[in-house]
């Protein structure tokens, strides 16, 4: 997710949304300016950046001086909560019949021949895979037993659910018709 719009004072501007762009240039008089991200959405947070603009030596080729301002943000706790909700929804569907046959469920529960299929613990939290990652993970434990003669008692099956935020072509969080984020949710790696 990136910041595509910002304001300085009463003026709002857009940045080039092309990921291959080397940036967008703006001209400012000398002074200290606060660049404030705008229109970041409900699930993304970004802090303002103060940047001094100095009068000074100019670039030989462009006859201008330049400074770089980087506006960065992060997914917020509200998105993490929505990711947890999506993880719990899939986990709960994986202990229903025929929901357990879904390819997004853990392989161990994808069977039509289970005499026991129970949820011992659903994810209670999710964590982001790393700074800037679009993926959250959570842990679940299922209790399963095959109806074959070999499996004499239920056993626990631990599984990791992966919740990946879907982004639109502009790099923004994709939202459904209710304004909620859209995720790709599945168990496994």
Regions found by a protein language model. Name each.
Residues 1-189:
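Short loop/turn and low-complexity linker motifs enriched in small/turn-promoting residues
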């Amino acid at each position: 997710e990136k910041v595509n719009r910002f304001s300085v004072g009463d003026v709002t501007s857009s940045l080039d949304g092309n990921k291959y762009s080397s940036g967008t240039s703006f001209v400012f008089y000398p002074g200290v300016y606060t660049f404030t991200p705008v229109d970041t959405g409900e699930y993304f947070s970004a802090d303002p950046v103060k940047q001094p603009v100095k009068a000074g030596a100019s670039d030989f080729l462009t006859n201008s001086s330049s400074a770089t301002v980087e506006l960065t943000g992060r997914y917020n706790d509200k998105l993490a909560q929505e990711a947890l909700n999506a993880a719990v929804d899939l986990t709960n569907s994986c202990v229903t019949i025929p929901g357990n046959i879904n390819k997004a469920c853990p392989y161990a529960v994808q069977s039509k021949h289970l005499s026991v299929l129970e949820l011992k613990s659903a994810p209670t939290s999710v964590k982001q895979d790393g700074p800037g990652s679009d993926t959250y993970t959570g842990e679940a434990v299922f209790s399963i037993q095959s109806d074959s003669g070999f499996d004499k008692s239920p056993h626990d099956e631990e599984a990791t659910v992966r919740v990946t935020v879907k982004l639109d072509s502009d790099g923004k969080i994709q939202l459904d018709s209710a304004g909620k984020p859209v995720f790709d949710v599945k168990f496994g790696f």
